[in-house]
Every structure is written in structure tokens, then in C-alpha cells.
Amino acid sequence: TLTEFYIEVEGKEPGTEALKKIEEKAYAMTRKDTHQAMEGFIHNLNTMHSRGGNQVVFSSINYGTDTSPEGRMVIEELLKATIEGLGTRGEVPVFPIQIFKVKDGVSYSEEDYKKAMENFEAALEGKMEFQAPNFDLFLKACRTTAKALFPNFMFLDTPYNKNEKWDIKDPKRYRYELATMGCRTRVYENIAGEKSSLGRGNLSFT
């Protein structure tokens, strides 16, 4: 633990202030590492060629509803890396195709929207508290789209995208969330079992 590590290094129990500084430094280092990982993720998917050799891998990533601290950090740093772009000229990365999932009560609420519109700059700068835990990420996603074309947006509350088993209290609720591919393919319904996007894909188009 942090306390045990501090005792080993300093030879005494850490105070509240010391623990706070340790936590802040660890958090900053983790954020930096996460950002570099997202930069590498985008770079690799725009430079690694498929086995055909004539194009990069057509890849997609869906996100927006993970409210855990680590999940939110990954989303935020991915958005930042997308705005930064590729190389010294900051070229817009084509891949992965990014899809931000909009879900009422998670990444959107009408009340939060109205509040943000009263002072949009303050909302973007993180100076407001919102009801929906990921509404701030939704705003950052909109800003990213305005600058870098991605992410696209998918609305999980659209009647044909809803899953009656989705529960905000379920830590594995992602199993009941629709995910799409960048080619706009929506693989979700299932005539032979439970509808889900997990483990699904295309073999051919019909």
C-alpha cells in the first residue's frame, strides 16, 4: 500500500498531506502513461497494415458509458490524442473509427444540457458539476468531433437500440449496449439467441 511504501522509504507514518501528494503524483503519472498509450493506440492503427498489405486495419472502438475512474481516464485521453492527431502536423487519424455512446443518465441528461448552454466555456473547462457522470465527456467528445471529425455518436435510447436488460447498477451493463462498426454495420439482433454486440462481426455483406 502507499502507507507501507512511505514507511519503508521515509521510516515513519505518512501524514494526510503526504498521502495527498503521493496520490496526486501517482494520478498524474498514470494519466501521462494513459495518454501515451492512447497516442500509441492511434498511431499503430494508422500504420499497421493488414495481411493484404494495401491498407491499414479497418478498426472501430465504441465508448462513452464507462463511469469508472480508469474508464473515464481512457476516454478522456483518447479524445485528447485524437485532437492532437498524427505526426508533427497533427493529421486527423482515420482509424480507429470512434463511436461515442450517448445514454440518458450516463453520458447525457436534458438538465445537464440546459445547464451547460448557460455557460458553455465553463462547462468545457470542467468548472461545472453535472448529474450524468459522463456528460462532461460527452461535451469533450463534441469538441473533438468539431476539430477531428470523430467520434461519431450513437444513441442507446433510440427504441430499436434499447435492451430491456440494461441496468445502470449492473457493472457489466456493457453486455446490453449496442456497438457498431465504423462501416456503419449494426450487429445486435440475434434470431438464434440473446441480442448483443459482444463477439459479433461480419463474414460477408448480403
Question: Which ranges hold each PLM region?
Answer:
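Conserved catalytic cores of very large enzyme subunits
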Residues: 1-206
